[in-house]
Amino acid sequence: MPKIKDLPEDQRPREKLLKFGPESLSDKELLAILIGHGLKGKSALEMAEDLLNEYKNLKGLAGKRLDEFMKIKGIKEAKIIKIAVAFEIAKRIYFT
């Protein structure tokens, strides 16, 4: 998969969000935005896809301990923190 910056503008998650709103994004694209950037040879979209393949969907991701995310290549502390915060915000909105 090419780097996100090499994709056509209408296929880049951030640009798509700005143009069409967050509801237009797939789960993979939402996660890619949280991940921010990939590693050499692996885009944020690919890392997001790896997470979704491992945990099936966003709901599957939501219940996991932070250290479990480290199984995915390139998912380190800073990326895990962003994902955990997003789920915590969603939980607080939903349950309070």
Put a short name on every predicted segment:
Residues 1-69:
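Long, highly charged, low-complexity intrinsically disordered interaction regions
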Residues 85, 89-96:
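Basic, amphipathic DNA-recognition helix from helix-turn-helix-like DNA-binding domains
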